């Protein structure tokens, strides 16, 4: 029944539902859209998106009725193309770090970018909801992510507090984002710097 109702919802209504579930005000939604717009304007991103700015409505529009937890329409391949290159992955990783340092909506944005871009973000837990009812309850767009290839635990020292985290899910990508389990500091990590 829940799945059947999704096809009658416009992207704007889906955004309203998500905003309500997340406790976001209209002003906060506008701020998130503004930040997503700035991401879209980054050269490495704009090339891949073909000039179409990212917004919450854009993301909501690709959540399908038939399989909302696994469908991303045309948006997913485009944004994944951005992180398929070292340049694109690095640009998006830097953007995420910038969000965490300066944007009051950073947690929501990081979750969205995590889903939409497939950029590995270590330390934020599982951000995928397989059940459409869970999607509606939590108000998060459940976009599919490729499975990450895990390696043996690797020590990594936080640049902020010198705490050593033993990362058990280091992705096989040249760049990823790590959140310190001690102080919460977020930093971009180059794969070559992790033993």
UniProtKB/Swiss-Prot annotation:
**Any idea what job this protein has?**
Assembly factor active in membrane morphogenesis.
* Protein name in the entry: Morphogenetic protein
Q: Which gene encodes it?
A: P12
């Amino acid at each position: 029944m829940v799945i059947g109702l999704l096809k009658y919802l416009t992207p704007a209504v889906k955004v309203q539902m998500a905003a309500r579930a997340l406790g976001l005000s209209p002003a906060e939604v506008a701020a998130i859209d503004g930040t997503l717009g700035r991401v879209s304007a980054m050269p490495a991103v704009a090339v891949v998106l073909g000039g179409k700015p990212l917004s919450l409505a854009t993301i909501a529009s690709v959540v399908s009725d038939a399989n909302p937890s696994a469908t991303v329409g045309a948006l997913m391949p485009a944004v994944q193309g951005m992180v398929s290159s070292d340049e694109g992955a690095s640009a998006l990783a830097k953007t995420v770090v910038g969000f965490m340092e300066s944007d009051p909506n950073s947690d929501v944005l990081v979750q969205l970018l995590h889903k939409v871009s497939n950029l590995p973000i270590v330390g934020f837990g599982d951000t995928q909801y397989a059940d459409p009812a869970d999607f509606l309850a939590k108000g998060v767009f459940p976009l599919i992510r490729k499975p990450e290839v895990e390696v043996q635990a690797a020590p990594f020292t936080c640049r902020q507090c010198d705490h050593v985290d033993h990362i058990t899910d280091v992705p096989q990508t040249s760049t990823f984002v790590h959140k310190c389990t001690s102080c919460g500091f977020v930093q971009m990590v180059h794969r070559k710097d992790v033993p």
